[in-house]
Amino acid sequence: MEEYQVYLELDISRQQHFLYPLIFREYIYGLAYGHDFNGSIFSENVDYDNKSSLLIVKRLITRMYQQNHLIISANDSKKNQFWGYNKNLYSQIISEGFAIVVEIPLSLQLNSSSEEAEIIKYYKNLRSIHSIFPFFEDKLTYLNYVSDARIPYPIHLEILVQVFRYWAKDAPLFHLLRLFLYEYCNWNNLITPKKLISTFSKSNLRVFLFLYNFYVCEYESIFLFLRNKSSHLQLTSFSVLFERIYFYGKIEHFVEVFAKDFSSTLSFFKEPFIHYVRYQGKSILASKNASLLMNKWKNYLIHLWQYHFDVWSQPRTIQINQFSERSFHLLGYFSNVRLNLSAVRSQMLENAFLIEIVMKKLETIVPIIPLIRSLAKAKFCNVLGHPISKPVWADSSDFDIIDRFLRICRNLSHYYNGSSKKKSLYRVKYILRLSCIKTLARKHKSTVRAFLKRLGSEKLLEEFFTEEEEILSLVFQRASSTLQGLYRGRIWYLDIIFINDLINHE
């Protein structure tokens, strides 16, 4: 692993940070072929063989530059052969090699100094899934308005390439990238949000994820710059957000009039702070201030996408709602803020008063309908939520079948333990439990009732409901009654690093 990194640093220093020559290095494709997506980039090349030969890669790139091979019909795109080689296989090798070429130098450049390394470490902590759960608990109950928006996808690959071009300065690399993208990839399947992630997972083309993440990073850097600047403006300066026409000649008169006649209205803008949360392509803007400020930021985002990134976004796709009126969907939860009215009796001498207090409570609800739809797609139940057997697992041993179902149930229960209402989660566990029983009965060629009767009891499958509760009771067995009540409520687990596969139902 260290040898690859040394070679790469030497190549970059010799070429003065030009990336195109790295495409023709043999070890790059060794890294790409032996790369484990869940592990480090520098992995051992256990499976490295002639399938990732540099000679074949050079031949493919040469054929790409030939004019008569720039246009390939859709019918031949999956079965076309290059001198006896499968084109899809080697297009994936080139793509993986290109992704490593652009990812590793970027990481080396960003970690070149200790100060930059600390900045990167700081932002990595902020941009993890762990920072979103405390935001739910600590901030949402004090905010009034939320804007639910999805970052629009680029309508053309050239937009992604141009955004990446701001960082690198290698013209041959971009020329090769354009040829590769247009000849080997069908972008029409990628611009649809519902097909984007599934297409990426099937093709395993990391270069697309890299370019898209670069696009999102560029957008967020501009947005956060504007947000930080606006939050540091003084009260008199920020008042111009009511109407831009007062910014120049009429600013003094404007401030004087508002300070005299509309001081109560102006006080809403004393804290022009916007909370921004994003996970994957879904973003949330939340604010404590009036809806006028949220509408301003909505227009800023639309104009930023249209004029800077050439991405069209309909204004109606960004909706602004009050927390108490409508919930929003993020990270597999439906979240809203419920208002609880309580009356407190206060007595002073002979007079008694009833004081109404409004308490805000955050509710995170498990979306049962999308989850049942995901379970039905995975063949654990039908579309109505009735459990069915899993025939493809019937050939496994009883232990493997139970272990697979328990693993899925444990993951869902682990992730959704942050919900304020567990009833929907118990229903999902019930579906998985009966599906497991029906799968075991199908394997033993018996009915469910006969299978359970032969076992004598249902204790074999009680782990679906008792395992997690038993673990938590052991953790808090010596704690006070207050702590024992806490673990029965909402818990955000800190070992969650990504959203569960079954939760990606959109």
Swiss-Prot record:
Domain of life of the source: Eukaryota
Major place of residence: plastid
Keywords, alphabetical: Chloroplast, mRNA processing, Plastid, RNA-binding, tRNA processing
Subcellular location field: Plastid, Chloroplast
GO cellular component: chloroplast
Described purpose of this protein according to its UniProt entry: Usually encoded in the trnK tRNA gene intron. Probably assists in splicing its own and other chloroplast group II introns.
Family per similarity comment: Belongs to the intron maturase 2 family. MatK subfamily.
Name of the protein: Maturase K
Source organism (scientific name): Cytisus scoparius
Organismal lineage: Eukaryota, Viridiplantae, Streptophyta, Embryophyta, Tracheophyta
